[in-house]
Every structure is written in structure tokens, then in C-alpha cells.
Amino acid sequence: MRHYEIVFLVHPDQSEQVPGMIERYTGILTQAGGQIHRLEDWGRRQLAYPIIELHKAHYVLLNVETTAEAVEELETAFRFNDAVLRSMVMRTKAAITEASPMAKAKDERDTRRSSEERAPRAEAAEEVEESAENTAE
């Protein structure tokens, strides 16, 4: 079996259907005896150039180890699904299991946002406590 990196872009109006699509496509690969090494749902992102007058798309990345027949079947499924705007399948030399730079950047943003949200809440809680102490005196 060979290692592949697969990226596909889904129409932004079909974003709710992406989990089902991922399940269906990973099922195609695993039924052929394949293994999913990495699965990343990057969500809606800006496109580098418009595709069918669309400026955003839902991105999904897969790193898999499977047979060439399963990859051909997956590419056929991409072709017949109108919601899939673009897809790319690249053969790689080894399995890639570490998080991609896109996923790392998203995780960093999420941790920054959550820490920024906690800080104002903590300050507001302190102010409420101080005002409660002042009114109690």
C-alpha cells in the first residue's frame, strides 16, 4: 500500500454536509484495507483565486495509506459530487501524522482567543466582588 495526501475543497453552502462527506470518503479508503494517519477539517477559508465566482471554500486534508484502486474510487466520488469544487491527491513517501502548519496556526489562534476571553471575565468578576464588598461596608 502507498501513502497519499488528499485535499479537497467543498462548496461553502454545503459546509454542514462536510462531516458526512468525510465519513463516506474515509469509509471508501478503510474498506479497501487502508489506514487514516491524519484527518484535518480546516473549515471555511479564503481561496487564492475565485472558483465559479466563489471566494471561500471548506478545506479538508487527509493523509492515508491505502491501495491505488481505493484512491481511484475516491477520485471518481469527488468527480461525481457537485459540492466538491477541487481535489488533489499526491503520493508521499511516508505517513505524515504530525499536525499541519494550518492546523497548528488554528490551534494557536484558538488558545489565544480563549485566554483573551478568560482575562476580561476574571477582571469583571473581581470588579463585581469589589463592588459587593463596598456595598456591604
UniProtKB/Swiss-Prot annotation:
Residues 104-124 have a biased composition (Basic and acidic residues). The keyword Lipid biosynthesis does not apply. GO terms for biological process: translation. GO terms for cellular component: cytosolic small ribosomal subunit. Gene3D superfamilies: 3.30.70.60. InterPro entries: Ribosomal_bS6 (IPR000529), Ribosomal_bS6_sf (IPR035980), Ribosomal_S6_plastid/chlpt (IPR020814), Transl_elong_EF1B/ribsomal_bS6 (IPR014717). SUPFAM superfamilies: Ribosomal protein S6. The keyword Ion transport does not apply. Residues 125-137 have a biased composition (Acidic residues). Residues 96-137 are annotated as: Disordered. GO terms for molecular function: small ribosomal subunit rRNA binding; structural constituent of ribosome. Keywords: Ribonucleoprotein, Ribosomal protein, RNA-binding, rRNA-binding. Belongs to the bacterial ribosomal protein bS6 family. Binds together with bS18 to 16S ribosomal RNA. NCBIfam families: S6 (TIGR00166). PANTHER family: MITOCHONDRIAL 28S RIBOSOMAL PROTEIN S6, SMALL RIBOSOMAL SUBUNIT PROTEIN BS6M. This is Small ribosomal subunit protein bS6. It comes from Shewanella halifaxensis (strain HAW-EB4).
